[in-house]
């Protein structure tokens, strides 16, 4: 493992910052930054002055005790300041606020330090991720934020590095390569966590054929402390530990699962209970998605789609609970985990609360891993419920190997990574629920890294073993905000949004729930009743979660916005647009909103000659190389990547000039040289143009 260590202060950097008139943190501020550790994060739960951890606290509650802004005065909230992130891709970051400084990440893992009082830029750090790396990620070049600990800011870069920065100056302190195999397309989009002096980071990539793991590094030096794999490797080699030997018993080696990695990546949720000295991680989907292709003899395939408890000091396995045994639908368990103490059947229990992709809300004993209850929070058709042992009661058709299954929820999940919050005052969890219709059919044949024209994005490395939407889904999409009672396992109230892919939530002691929406609004609700109390325009869809903090006796509410993520690549929720932006609101704010622009959607493309006989071949090529970013020509409106059905005719006529040679690599578009021929590009053109002609309204002439 190579660690690159940098000097803590570079005079040139400091002079450069001073030359643009920015005030650096004072000595007292630096001491405050240096004191941020898990004990300080726990203490902040009482005051709420800062937002020092990804989920506000190490339990991930996203509940602030601040109540200066409350259900009786929130309608007076106004913009205090805005800050441009100068980005055009998805913004998924939860800002961290410590002693008057906000740290927030933009696409491509760029870190911004902002004066939390005024919105002035303090410093910016760009890890210089190669833009060609974009095609190695399933779900946009996003980053969900940083960790701050003892004077350092930690960020995971999209290309797999963990980087420590000086919190005062933004200068790099150390950098470590976290990837075990550079021939595999691992990415990092999640925020690091720091528990007991160790920086914990996972990764993503299960759609492409990787083996999941998390790694802990010494926060001071960057030295590796431990690594824990989530799925077993080649059984002909010694297993790393007893947990991997146990897990291997649940996989069929005849499928040679290790060649495709197996999946199980820890790409998002990690929380920590200092009293039990346990950390909890949520693991991802299988690689490939299709259960019978990766493990022909069946089996639960541990530790896919599971909650796993580990010792944060050693990485030793303690317990697990698998929510979706033998995952077959991309039902990751990487969504937000919240630790809470509740009365359950007349007894005070330490539990964890979880609403993963599979559509069920779980309550699990966090001391033992025992299953307590599960109830669906959205319609589901893959299972009718869970038995008393905590296993799903599956429907027969959900695992059909020869007919399409209209999965409800689909792979976008009944709830995805968008933040969930929990109020100790109301006893309710608040989270964005959704459904994006998708039908799935197992591929007839499959092998790792084989390009299967018609299998989604296999031409760019996808490895799912499924055809997506071989028949049109029967369901309609929806998005809603839910308030859920985890004890009664029932919905208390809901607010229906105009589309899926809405932002995460914040709940406060002021009896308020805040949420940004796909249709570019920032909203506040009465946490008890669900009544909408306030909203403000954002200029672009919001997918990240808001935070709140106090400075100079005033409470602020902030949200970082920027439409994107996997759904936002090809679909949009708002006709307004603005670069990535941080907005901060207060009760006496007087700032003006930045100017919003309106999407300009051209007419369906026409005027380019094509051979109709090429449409069938072009359809399969488009699905395997283009569809997940550009959507269906003329059907999806385009997200932060344009829909080709509405392109200028000259672009489609000369499509090979954009597809070959890599002229758009700096925007994240792959170079398809050697992967597509000019003949195949002409077939893709035929599909785009033929689809546009097929859906074009008839002329009145």
Please report, for each region that a protein language model flagged, where it lies by residue.
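Repeat-blade elements of multi-bladed beta-propeller folds
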Residues: 51-55, 90-110, 135-161, 185-211, ...
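Extracytoplasmic beta-rich repeat domains
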Residues: 83-94, 124-147, 175-191, 229-269, ...
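Gly/Gly-Pro-rich "capping" loops immediately C-terminal to redox-active cysteine motifs
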Residues: 631-664
